[in-house]
Structure formats: structure tokens, C-alpha cells
């Protein structure tokens, strides 16, 4: 850990596919980061990164670990466990992309390794840093949330085809509704399937929380357009969030009647919409800035290993419910 707050944190990026490239891009711009290098077996990609970001390229990430204090891991999900363990065993702080791992056992191993090494383990649930979600948490703080409704649709692509739509897309919203509901999940039901060979690519899941909140989540890779939305139905309002456009609208009812001087009704106001201002900061920029502050000991991770493990456990149960429809019964143990 850099003791001098004026000295940037030496950081590296492991995996420079689509997401890893953006990690390197943002880190190269952050004042608190010294992007030492990127690690990826693809030499051509590595050369492009060194030219673009002014850092070094490592064919083997292990060769980079002795030169950095922290890493961002953006490799395929199946590699999260071995790569994460190697970094933590080397005493390096870790920000790992979501999901934390491919299985609950692997997630537990990462959490235990971080604790034993005294290292940070932060998980990249990036929507926590979306300006619209940050404002949403403020708006509903004084509201009684009843129903949460999330939609996350994308066109089919060649990325992230090693995991289901639950682990690729829906897990974002699982994490968000857990944060908003602030209660254990006691009921779960899900339906979905696959449009072709490969992992599940469309799912709807319903989560029932101990405090009565119900969340409906839909994720699909069959859409021709991207949708990233979350609505909070509260006792006295409806809050609609668009994560793509970073917008937030609050719908409220009104009960005011307007009449002329002689008592004749002219019109009535049935409701109004508030447009909440949000910042224009890039969520990844905010996430990485937060990670660096955590490395310096100034903040605690917004999403640590335990929180990410809880989201993964629910994702696993949703997948099981889709594959085995007869299992949509109340959970034996609240999650």
C-alpha cells in the first residue's frame, strides 16, 4: 500500500479483452493510478495497449505481480478463481470483474485467501457506481419500497458466451435489488431457456424478501436493442431508472382540483413527474477511483467478496430453477 497519498498506486490489468481494455484506459487517466502494465497472452493486443496507454505488456501475469500493489482482473469467469488466488497469494489487492467466480466454492476460496493475505477483494458490480443508481438509493431512502422491476436486454454477441445470461447480465440486477431491499431472500421462482445451443439466454426471476418486498428481474440476449432499467414501485411514488442514459424520473400522484371563481371545475392535476439530476461521471471511472481509495485505506469496498458471493448464490439458484422448474419453492435458508 502506498503510504504517501501523493504517490500513485502501482496497478496492473490482467486480461485486455473488451472490459479489460476499458480498465486500462481509465486507469491511465486517473491521477491516483500508475498503470504499470497489462497482462494478456495475446501479443498483438498487448502491443496495442502499450502504445495506447504507455504501459508495459506481460505475456504472463505472474511476471507482473511483483511490480504492482493492485490489479484489476478482467479474464473469463472460469479463470477468476485461479488468477485471483495467484494475485492474493502474492499479496496484491484485487478488483475482480463480476461474477466473483464460477462457483460458490471458488468464491469462498477467494474470500478466505484475501482475508489470510490481508488484501482487499472488491468485485466489479459496476452498476453500483452508475450515477442514476446512486440517486435512486437517495430517492427511495425515505420511501417504502414494495416492488422492484429490472430489465436488462442485449442483442446476441460473441462476448461472454461461456456463461448464462444470469451470470453475464442478470447478476447486475440481483446485486442492485439486494442493496435496495435490504432483507434476506426467502422465496425464489424463475423461468427461461435457450434460443439455441449453449448457455441459457433468457430468464425471468422473482425474488421474495423477508420484509415483503418483491423483485422481478428479466434478462435476455434475444433483443435487438439494449435495455438497462430498474423501477422501484413505492407506496407513494414510482421511480424509473435508465442506466444507459443515466436518467431518473419520479412519478407522484396529486390530488389538487382547480376551479373557476364560481366553483365550476376547470381541470385537475392527477400527478406530476420529477426529473432528478445526475452527474455525468463514467461508472467505471467512479468504480476504479473508489478501488484506489480502498487500497489507500480511505474507504471500504462498496461490493466485497461476501456481498458478491451472495449475489452469485442467488444466480446459481435461479439457473437451477430454470433448468429444473419444479424447484421454485420457498428457500429452506434465507439468503
Positions of PLM-derived features:
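N-terminal Rossmann-like dinucleotide-binding module
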Residues: 1-53, 177
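C-terminal helix-rich "cap/oligomerization" subdomain common to oxidoreductases
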Residues: 1-5, 70-72, 210, 290-335
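Beta-loop-alpha module in the N-terminal Rossmann-like domain of NAD(P)-dependent dehydrogenases
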Residues: 23, 53-111
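Active-site loop of classical SDR/Rossmann-like NAD(P)-dependent oxidoreductases
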Residues: 41, 275-289, 303
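Hydrophobic residues in well-ordered beta-strands that form the structural core
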Residues: 59, 73, 96, 121-123, ...
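A contiguous active-site-proximal alpha/beta segment in oxidoreductase catalytic domains
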Residues: 101-160
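Mid-domain beta-loop-alpha active-site segment that forms a flexible
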Residues: 124-131, 155-187, 307-308
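Contiguous beta-strand/loop segments that form the cofactor/metal-binding neighborhood of enzyme cores
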Residues: 174-251, 281-298, 316, 333-335
Amino acid at each position: 500500500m502506498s503510504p504517501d497519498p501523493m504517490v500513485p498506486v502501482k496497478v496492473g490489468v490482467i486480461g485486455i479483452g473488451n472490459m479489460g481494455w476499458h480498465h486500462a484506459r481509465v486507469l491511465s487517466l486517473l491521477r491516483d493510478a500508475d498503470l504499470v502494465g497489462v497482462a494478456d497472452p495475446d501479443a498483438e493486443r498487448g502491443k496495442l495497449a502499450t502504445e495506447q496507454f504507455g504501459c508495459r505488456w506481460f505475456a504472463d501475469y505472474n511476471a507482473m505481480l511483483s511490480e504492482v500493489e493492485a490489479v484489476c482482473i478482467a479474464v473469463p469467469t472460469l479463470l477468476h478463481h485461479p488468477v485471483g488466488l495467484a494475485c492474493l497469494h502474492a499479496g496484491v489487492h484485487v478488483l475482480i470483474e463480476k461474477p466473483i467466480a464460477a462457483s460458490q466454492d471458488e468464491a469462498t476460496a477467494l474470500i478466505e485467501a484475501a482475508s489470510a493475505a490481508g488484501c482487499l477483494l472488491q468485485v466489479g458490480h459496476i452498476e453500483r457506481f452508475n450515477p442514476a443508481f446512486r440517486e435512486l438509493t437517495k430517492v427511495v431512502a425515505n420511501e417504502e419500497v414494495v416492488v422492484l422491476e429490472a430489465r436488462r436486454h442485449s442483442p446476441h454477441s460473441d462476448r461472454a458466451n461461456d456463461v448464462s445470461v444470469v451470470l453475464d447480465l442478470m447478476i447486475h440486477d440481483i446485486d442492485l435489488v439486494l442493496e435496495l431491499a435490504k432483507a434476506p431472500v426467502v422465496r425464489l421462482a424463475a423461468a427461461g431457456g435457450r434460443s439455441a445451443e449453449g448457455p441459457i439466454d433468457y430468464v425471468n426471476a422473482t425474488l421474495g424478501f423477508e420484509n415483503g418486498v418483491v423483485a422481478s428481474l428479466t434478462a435476455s440476449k434475444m433483443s435487438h436493442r439494449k435495455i438497462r432499467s430498474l423501477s422501484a414501485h413505492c407506496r407513494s411514488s414510482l421511480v424509473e431508472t435508465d442506466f444507459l442514459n443515466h436518467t431518473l424520473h419520479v412519478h407522484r400522484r396529486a390530488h389538487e382540483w382547480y376551479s373557476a371563481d364560481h366553483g365550476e371545475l376547470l381541470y385537475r392535476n392527477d400527478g406530476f413527474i420529477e426529473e432528478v439530476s445526475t452527474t455525468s461521471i463514467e461508472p467505471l471511472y467512479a468504480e476504479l477511483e473508489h478501488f484506489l481509495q480502498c487500497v489507500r485505506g480511505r474507504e471500504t469496498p462498496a461490493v466485497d467478496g461476501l456481498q458478491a458471493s451472495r449475489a452469485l448464490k442467488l444466480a446459481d439458484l435461479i439457473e437451477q430453477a430454470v433448468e429444473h422448474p419444479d424447484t421454485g419453492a420457498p428457500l429452506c435458508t434465507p439468503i
